[in-house]
Amino acid sequence: MELRARGDRLILGREVCYNPLAVFEVAMTEDSMGRALLAITMGDPAGVGPEIVLKALRHAVVYRRCRPLVLGDRRILERAASWVGSPGLEFDVVDDPAAGRYTSGAITLLNLTNAPPGECPTGQVSAAAGRAAVEYVFRACDLAMAGAVDAVVTAPLNKAAMNLAGFAYAGHTELLAERTGAPEVSMLLVGPKLRVVHVSTHVALAEAIRRVTRARVETVIDLAHTSCLALGISAPRIAVAGLNPHAGEGGLFGDQEEREILPAVCSARARGLNVSDPQPPDTVFLRAVKGEFDVVVAMYHDQGHIPMKLLAFDSGVNVSIGLPIIRTSVDHGTAFDIAGSGQAREDSLLAAIDVALQMVAAHGTSAY
């Protein structure tokens, strides 16, 4: 497959400049079966997910690059269509992904009819919306596991709504890990000039510190390596952030670097991986942005998320790594405060679609 760049974008390999509204076109045959099939979940019905899905799929280039299958509720999408200036939008409702038309101007939809609008008020947490959002992810995951779709791209769900519905997951990654039986997973963030993998994510800071163990750090270094390979980066250069200020300063400010992190680094090096010593957290991300490293292993959620949000608030992508399926997502939440206003931007979802397609291409697969 020949790639032609148009504008700045995230491409396979080390170049990571991305402008999601100037997505490059892919030279391919006219045969629609040459396009990867992506399952795109609608997200929480009460949030901005339905709006950004519809906005993203207004870009004709998306259909030239892939076959997007939306998993959601037609009633919610029709409600959102009026907010984003697309009243009367056509829906191609299917029961089987193989039956979809996947043409620009019509939304190919697997209609789960599980989100009655009256039970999913816009901008509000509800058990009905939380349950529906989880069911979209379950169905998309099952399709990917069965090989019926090439990858899963998720719009945001709301953790409070999800838990109110009885699903005690910290987020998409944990949900998908259980659904697929994946033993070791982590979160990869991909942004305009930075990639970050986390040792821990949605836990209290005290618990995050306890989770900085040699075994876990070594596992995440391995996940960082394989995630870069999945993005087409050969021989990735991996930076490892320290936990403490100045990476412990030789034990003056904490000993986790010498006791847990450095042994994990040495073990990874012994297996041929290109991994740095524990680096001062306040400078390692800048060095990665300047091109010295391909990915940074962050020790906890905010250590990795703060630089990513600063650099890529609208265009960051969340990738679940360690799963037997490809899953990417927007790097923002349900934004209840603007849901229903039509203001939500689709940039991050376009970026998530782009990264999913890169991973499918690197993996060399396409659904039927």
Can you describe what each PLM-predicted range is?
Residues 189-211, 215-218:
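Ligand-binding beta-strand-loop-alpha-helix segment within the catalytic cores
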Residues 179-194, 323-337:
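Short, flexible loop segments at boundaries between secondary-structure elements
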Residues 164-186:
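Glycine/threonine-rich beta-strand-loop-alpha-helix active-site module
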